[in-house]
Every structure is written in structure tokens, then in C-alpha cells.
Amino acid sequence: MKSYIEPFIASKALSQNSQKAYRYDLQQFCQLVGERVNQDKLLLYQNSIANLSLSAKKRKLSTANQFLYYLYQIKYLNSYFRLTDTMKVMRTEKQQAAIINTDIFYQKTPFVWGQLISLLILELGLTPSEVAGIEVANLDLSFQMLTLKTKKGVRVLPLSQILIPFLEQQLIGKEVYLFEHRGIPFSRQWFFNHLKTFVRSIGYEGLTAQKLREQFILKEKLAGKSIIELSDILGLKSPVTLEKYYKS
């Protein structure tokens, strides 16, 4: 199984530092699990990282899950195995969610629909209903802008350069909506299922649309946006729901 580490790393667009981290984590994983993967060995690996910090544990689980999925794709494994963090983390009201490393969200994946849904939430802070309502006519990729029309009003949101290729790929053949079938928007359940499948494939099972939107809020606050500015970006009637993120 160790011989597949380098081909796996080569299949992903990673920086030099990320390659080193992936290589280190996977060498440890393979050393403990060995050449034959089964649930007992995976449980052994989970126990071996149980006392690490939450961020380190999440990173190792994510890396191992990506590798396991890769091995399943290339038919090295006959079954799809997956590691889950069974440790429950207790939080007090004073504790806030931490900003996660989102590099993996931009990497190549077979789950392109779920990926784009998650990126639109991460990059723009959209709700699932706002994502579903994106119309082709309101996307201007040349000027990198999205005009979002909702019952609350109209917002013009800038599109980052990194988001453009993902949008270009999915705009091909669309008639009315970005997410549609022959001009008819997909159902709410369709969005839920595709988002769930994608985040699970990259090791973030349980990461909901609400939590992804929270990541946008945390990053915008960190970038220096005031509570009023952020409220306007999100199209909120009042900044009250954002107050918990701005408490010292």
C-alpha cells in the first residue's frame, strides 16, 4: 500500500509543504495499518491519534480518508473504508468554531456539483436557497460579479479569481439556472445530498451548509469586516445574528 502514496500525492494539486505533510501522515498510516485494510486496523489507527490536538487529528483523518478513497477508485481496495472521529468535543457558549483549512475544497474531485455548492457558500456566504436561485443571466464572469436577486432585495457580490474556473465548467449547457435540469432548478434534497457526498469524500463528514457559511463569516471578520459590512454582504435585515462572532 505504501507504493501508492506517491501516485496519490501526484494526483493532487498540493504545495510543497502540503505534500510533505500528506507524505508524513500517510507513511505513519501505512506503517500502522499494513498492507491489508480492515476495520480493526483502522480502529487501531484511530486510537493511535486519539490524544492529538483536534486540528492535527482532523488533518490526519482527512488525509487518510482521501487516500482510502483513492485506493478504492483505483480498485486496490474492493470495499470503501472510512475513518470517523468518534470523539465528542464538548463546547461552552463562549467557545466559537475555529477556521478550518479549506485548501482541500478546491482540489480535483468527481463530486463536482457538491464541490461548487460548497465553494459558493465558502466564498460568498450564500444560503442553500440562494445557491439554488443563481441564474445564468446574473453571472458575469468577465467582470467577476454575481447579481443575486432574492425576496430580501438585490446584492452584487464579487467573484474571486479562484472560483471562476469552477463556474465556467458548470455553466456549459445551462438555460436558466446554474443548477438545473432543462431549465428547472433542482430540489432542496438534491442540494443536500450532493453537498453531503462531497464533504464526506474530503473527510469533513457532518460539515453542513450552515457550518460552511459560518466559515465565511469567521474569515470575513478576520479580514477586518465590521458587523454592519458583513450583515450587508449576507443580505441580513439586522446584524443581531452576527453579534456572537464579534463578542470579545
Swiss-Prot record:
Residues 85-248 form the Tyr recombinase domain. InterPro entries: CB (IPR044068), DNA_brk_join_enz (IPR011010), Integrase-like_cat_sf (IPR013762), Integrase_catalytic (IPR002104), Integrase_recombinase_N (IPR010998), Tyrosine_recombinase_XerD-like (IPR020876). Coiled coil: none annotated. Transmembrane segments: none annotated. This is Tyrosine recombinase XerD-like. It is found in: Cytoplasm. Keywords: Cytoplasm, DNA integration, DNA recombination, DNA-binding. One of its GO terms (biological process) is DNA transposition. Belongs to the 'phage' integrase family. XerD-like subfamily. It comes from Streptococcus pyogenes serotype M3 (strain ATCC BAA-595 / MGAS315). The keyword Nucleotide-binding does not apply. NCBIfam families: PRK02436.1.
